[in-house]
């Protein structure tokens, strides 16, 4: 098996430009070093990219590169993981049995402080860039996001794009069946996460839901003490990553 951990860094833009400029900030270096150590632990290759694939689109859409760029066809499984995440486990994610893709539902998002924003984005009319209305435009009037299998009481499944574990078969299937990225941006102007959720709602895709320990976020799943296998530092929580990096880094060192 030839597996890859893939990350990319592109300068932040607009209202959150202070999080990272042309040079990679220290929090991003922390995330990179963490994933390099994890790749070595998992006997996987590691790649950090700085070049844009979709040069005409929002840089955050470049996480889709692992799907559309034939370069990745040489790999069996590809773990695309954001730089604002730290690995805190020795469990090998590549050992998980998946079909097309494995991701984590954002448990608690619908009822969090971001829930109002999400409802507005999702439930607005198509003319107002509504995501659900756009989904019905793509897939038919009866379409709706599926329920989470692990967390069925949630309104619908909403997968966080910060961690995506793709099989080769899944990437090739996505390349064939995902709808136009340009059309999505034209209608919604949103980023990759909602695009991926829309596309993976198609019944043809076999999505493995991982529990939240594989992508625990700082906004509403933990506050002071990260408690996941992989911890996701959203917004300005990123600036705490360098202090925690060494704690997790030692977990991944070879044991005698």
Where on the chain are the PLM-derived regions?
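Charged, glycine/proline-rich intrinsically disordered loops and linkers
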Residues: 16-20, 111-151
């Amino acid at each position: 098996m030839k597996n890859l951990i893939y990350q990319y860094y592109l300068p932040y833009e607009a209202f959150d430009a202070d999080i990272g400029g042309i040079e990679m900030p220290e929090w991003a270096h922390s995330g990179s070093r963490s994933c390099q150590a994890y790749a070595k632990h998992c006997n996987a290759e590691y790649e950090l990219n700085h070049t844009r694939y979709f040069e005409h689109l929002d840089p955050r859409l470049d996480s889709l590169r692992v799907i559309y760029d034939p370069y990745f066809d040489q790999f069996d499984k590809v773990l695309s993981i954001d730089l604002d995440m730290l690995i805190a486990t020795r469990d090998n994610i590549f050992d998980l049995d998946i079909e097309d893709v494995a991701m984590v539902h954002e448990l608690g998002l619908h009822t969090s402080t971001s829930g109002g924003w999400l409802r507005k984005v999702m439930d607005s009319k198509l003319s107002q860039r509504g995501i659900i209305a756009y989904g019905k435009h793509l897939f038919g009037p009866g379409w709706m996001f599926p329920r989470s299998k692990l967390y069925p009481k949630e309104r619908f499944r909403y997968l966080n794009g910060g961690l995506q574990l793709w099989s080769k078969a899944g990437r090739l299937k996505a390349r064939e069946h995902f709808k136009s990225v340009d059309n999505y941006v034209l209608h919604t102007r949103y980023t990759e996460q909602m695009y991926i959720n829309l596309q993976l709602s198609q019944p043809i895709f076999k999505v493995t839901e991982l529990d939240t320990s594989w992508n625990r976020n700082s906004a509403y799943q933990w506050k002071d003490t990260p408690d996941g296998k992989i911890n996701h530092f959203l917004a300005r929580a990123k600036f705490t990553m360098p202090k925690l990096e060494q704690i997790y880094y030692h977990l991944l060192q070879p044991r005698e």
